[in-house]
Amino acid sequence: MARIKVHELRDKSKSDLSTQLKELKAELASLRVAKVTGGAPNKLSKIKVVRKSIAQVLTVSSQKQKSALREAYKNKKLLPLDLRPKKTRAIRRRLTKHQASLKTEREKKKDMYFPIRKYAIKV
């Protein structure tokens, strides 16, 4: 089997990807048998190509699955952990902008009764 182009894989459906994956795994198994029995050198060099093709199919299928999940959870309040943006632990625990901007009653009164003085300079 020749190398697979990823842009062609992205157009395929989930069932097509799974059938292609089964075919590639079967081919890899036969190539490994040929390796043990002392097969031709061109078959041995083909193992790397087939393994890479399997990885590409698995990657595309997982990407499709993740994008479908993103669509499903698009307007929901809570997201699964693996769909949330990856940030540092400290950033994830930081206060939100709204929480940081909140003021206590005392602060509000102080700001109201003692506003910042504004001066105009005559020219």
Swiss-Prot record:
On the tree of life, the source organism's domain of life is Eukaryota
Q: Which Gene3D superfamilies match?
A: 1.10.287.310, 6.10.250.3450
Q: Which GO terms describe its biological process?
A: maturation of LSU-rRNA from tricistronic rRNA transcript (SSU-rRNA, 5.8S rRNA, LSU-rRNA); translation
Q: Which residues cross the membrane?
A: none
Its cellular-component GO annotations read: cytosolic large ribosomal subunit
CDD domains cross-referenced by the UniProt entry: Ribosomal_L29_HIP
Keyword tags? Ribonucleoprotein, Ribosomal protein
Q: Which GO terms describe its molecular function?
A: structural constituent of ribosome
- PROSITE patterns according to UniProt: RIBOSOMAL_L29
Family statement drawn from the similarity comment of this UniProt entry: Belongs to the universal ribosomal protein uL29 family.
Protein name (record): Large ribosomal subunit protein uL29x
